[in-house]
Amino acid sequence: MSSVIFLGTPNFGSVVLQGLIDQGYDVKAVVTQPDKRVGRKQVVHQSAVKQTALKHNLPVYQPAKLSGSDELAELMKIEPDFIVTAAYGQFLPTKFLKSAKIAPVNVHGSLLPKYRGGAPIQYSVLNGDKETGVTIMEMVKKMDAGDIFSQKALPIEDDDTSGTLFDKLSILGRDLLLETLPKFIDGTVTRTPQNEDKVVFSPNISKEQEQIKLTMTAEQANNLIRALNPDPGAYVMLDGKRFKIWKAKPLAEKTSFPAGTLVTNKKKFVISMAGGSELELLEVQPTGKKKMNIKDYLNGQGSHFTSGEKIIDE
């Protein structure tokens, strides 16, 4: 079976790696981001890809920066048939990409050339797209700009979040990769250059983008909430404190209240957004609290507000 160096970090990558292992590919090395200390107790956290690699006794490399590292020198000696990446999180040196005997291949979570960059799945939800997908593409020096070998589309459901799409697309990407790699061997692989006129970028989500603005309609706010679930979460400033909203629902009803006003907190919690649109909150997280459904919130702090009160700060 063909030899592979695999590079990836989150669960999206581990699903793809597991697929290569299950299919019998000879995984010579796994490269992932360094372990991180997380939480107040600074517990060491290994990436999902590292955990999968260790489970199968595969050699793991974790350079803080691959370019110029000792690890790169070792990896260059392997000269695998394929270099495969799936959500690795670093630029790869061109000389390393060229060390693959057959091809350096990336599993990308969008229908390229739409959403080049580090957050393609989040932007597909944020922009209210009805469809996303995966692309198997050649890795080149320029970010996500290589020729396309194969693509497969996936509908985005109204209740999809970035989290649910990560799970769906990791499976779709795994399966499409495993369909595509044999085509290199039998000579049937096709390559399609990307249309540069249709390129859309999806840079990593900034801290500023995490806040729900009162200039947003209920639908736009809901798209942001879904896009930032499960991480890092979208928030409003409620009573001067950060208030995360994990799940919400735009309503058909309209209100005359200005944006940021409580419409009702009787049995449900509805706030006004731009254009008189209404957003019903379903799962929330006040500062210093755990996530809770809206019923629990209304039984406590949420009962203290009154309809018509401006509760969301700019």
Swiss-Prot record:
Annotated TM spans: none
Any one Gene Ontology molecular-function term assigned to this protein's record: methionyl-tRNA formyltransferase activity
Enzyme class, broadest EC rank: transferase
Catalytic activity: L-methionyl-tRNA(fMet) + (6R)-10-formyltetrahydrofolate = N-formyl-L-methionyl-tRNA(fMet) + (6S)-5,6,7,8-tetrahydrofolate + H(+)
Record key words, sorted: Protein biosynthesis, Transferase
Record's protein name: Methionyl-tRNA formyltransferase
Domain of life of the source: Bacteria
A Pfam family of this chain: Formyl_trans_C
Cellular component, GO annotation: cytosol
Gene field: fmt
